[in-house]
Design a protein with these regions (language model features):
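Inter-helix linker motif
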Residues: 12, 28, 59, 63, ...
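Intrinsically disordered, low-complexity repeat/linker tracts enriched for polar/charged residues
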Residues: 19, 76-81, 89-91, 120-122, ...
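Methionine-biased hydrophobic packing positions in alpha-helices, especially
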Residues: 40-42, 59, 90, 144, ...
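Accessory end-domains appended to solenoid repeat scaffolds used in host defense
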Residues: 156, 462-468, 477, 490-511, ...
Length: 524
């Protein structure tokens, strides 16, 4: 039975493992401690953690090793609160955590950001004198503090480690990279090398990530040369993909594509990274070209590819391509399991102005969230369909979904573009009391537009005076646009001077002011 259970765990076959479990019960072997531990281990490996926990509770004797397996399983599945609960329960039974327990539970603390628990565990480790026994615990402590953003403590632990290694440094480097602190990452890499330690793949992955986020292209080029000299591009595809990411984030997409094309091996992630880079820089035709080239190489798009390429289709209005991709998604049955992909489809159709299709896709999604409705509402707003937007807004709330800042911006924008003054005023008035949302600059801008469009200029001034700050070029351009329609020279002059104060080279403000004079049959 033990051998069969090990095999079931190795291949992740929970169904076969459950059948073995039933056989164990029917033969009365459940009291056997070794067999019970094997059962629990099988369920953990199959990610059936509730079943594993049930087996553990039924064991005649529970040992630290059994608890460690369950705690590690919960941490791996991201159920860190359950891992912490198991940690407490284990100690309440009189069992003493070992190094393996502490490593897992520190990871849980770092993932959840529960720094108080982490500090408490740190004290227990110090009290038992465990830090001097290998690097595992020290590295886990550094990782926990770094993930919680407590870098002073992470550095202190690192400095106190007598036998720190590249993993120790990587834990600190990864934390700084996650926080976008590029200078600290670079400094850590230099300090690590002064200790005679060589950066490894993980070091470079963290380094390239933060250099991309901070657009530190000069250092990025140096790191690229170092990677080539070390021959890492031939050893790990992740390094090449991270280089593509770094150049893409820095806006050097031609270089990113050149790096990709020179990789000895490229995969779907390589192409997804480049396609996403082109999308972020609004070079959507290039993204579509990469999509075709990737498939010509025999690589199949995954969910991430489809999400990126649907965004490109929406931005370029490539509705035929978007429909073709939609068909591929349906054929692969991907909409059943991924709400982000469904939302991307709604967004693509909405941006292309095919609003009936966008709504149909939304209504057919197995699960809808606020983002789903926001995508449709943004489409209605973009095309000035106020009544439809208000209808969707009501239906969304009837489904029990709570509007967020983006939702209210979309509805206000739809009202402003379709002249729905009363509806806009009611929504704006209720934002704080009904929805608990303080109006943002974008919300005020929408109100300025809707009030200006119907000539309520006294209310426009009141709205601007109520804003947290009037230093918004978008607001004053909205006022100028409204004044152009109605020929309101007095308010137009005020808006023009405010726009010039914020941006003296704004050509749009000059054009709008000239049009205001023209519509009022006046000369400047």
């Amino acid at each position: 039975f033990i051998c069969i259970l090990n095999a079931c765990g190795s291949i992740g076959s929970v169904d076969k493992g459950t059948r073995v479990h039933n056989a164990v019960i029917s033969m009365g072997f459940l009291e056997d401690l070794v067999l019970g531990s094997a059962l629990m281990d099988m369920y953990v490996k199959c990610s059936a953690l509730e079943k594993a926990h049930k087996v553990l509770k039924e064991l005649p004797v529970r040992e630290v090793v059994s608890w460690n397996a369950l705690i590690a399983g919960y941490v791996k599945q991201g159920q860190c609160h359950k891992a912490l609960n198991c940690f407490e329960r284990m100690q309440s039974e009189g069992l003493c955590p070992d190094v393996v327990t502490f490593v897992s539970i520190l990871k849980a603390c770092g993932t959840r950001g529960t720094i108080d628990n982490g500090k408490q565990i740190h004290r227990k480790i110090l009290g038992r004198g465990l830090l001097g026994k290998g690097t595992m615990l020290g590295n886990a402590l550094i990782d926990m503090y770094a993930k919680c953003g407590i870098f002073s403590e992470a550095e202190k632990v690192l400095k106190e480690l007598s036998d720190r290694d590249v993993v120790s440094w990587n834990a600190l480097i990864a934390g700084y990279a996650q926080q976008g602190q590029g200078n600290e990452v670079v400094n850590c890499v230099k300090l690590m090398q002064t200790e005679g330690l060589c950066p490894n793949t993980i070091t470079f992955l963290c380094l390239l990530k933060v250099l991309g986020r901070t657009q530190a292209i000069d250092i990025g080029r140096e790191v690229h040369n170092d990677i080539v000299d070390r021959g890492l591009l031939d050893k790990d595809i992740r390094v090449g993909n991270s280089l593509v990411y770094m150049y893409g984030k820095c806006g050097m997409l031609a270089k990113a594509q050149k790096v990709l094309e020179e990789l000895p091996i490229r995969d779907v992630v390589s192409w997804n990274t480049l396609i996403a880079g082109y999308g972020q820089q609004e070079q959507c035709q290039e993204a579509l070209d990469c999509f075709e080239q990737m498939q010509n190489e025999g690589l199949y798009p995954d969910v991430v590819t489809f999400i990126c390429i649907l965004k490109a289709c929406g931005s370029t209005g490539a509705i035929d391509k978007g429909k073709q991709i939609h068909e591929s998604i349906i054929n692969k049955c991907l909409l059943r399991s991924d709400i982000v992909l469904g939302n991307a489809l709604v967004n693509m159709y909405a941006k292309c102005g095919v609003l009936a299709r966008a709504r149909k896709v939304l209504e057919e999604l197995p699960v809808r969230n606020v983002v789903s409705w926001n995508a449709l509402l943004a489409g209605y707003a973009q095309h000035g369909h106020g009544p439809e937007a208000l209808n969707c807004f009501e239906k969304m709330q009837n489904e029990g979904l709570i509007p967020n800042v983006v939702t209210l911006s979309c509805v206000l924008s739809a009202c402003s573009r379709s002249g729905k003054l009363n509806e806009a005023q009611m929504l704006f008035t209720n934002m704080t009391t009904k929805y608990g949302i303080n109006p943002t600059l974008e919300h005020y801008t929408c109100m300025v537009v809707v009030l200006g469009n119907v000539g309520c200029f006294d209310y426009v001034i009141s709205a601007i005076e109520g804003m947290p700050s009037s230093d918004s070029l978008a607001v004053w351009l909205a006022v100028l646009t409204a004044c152009r329609k109605c020929g309101n020279v007095k308010l137009g002059r005020l808006a023009f001077h405010q726009a010039m104060r914020l941006d003296g080279s704004c050509s749009t403000a000059y054009v709008l002011m000239a049009n205001i004079f023209a519509s009022a049959n006046m000369q400047g």
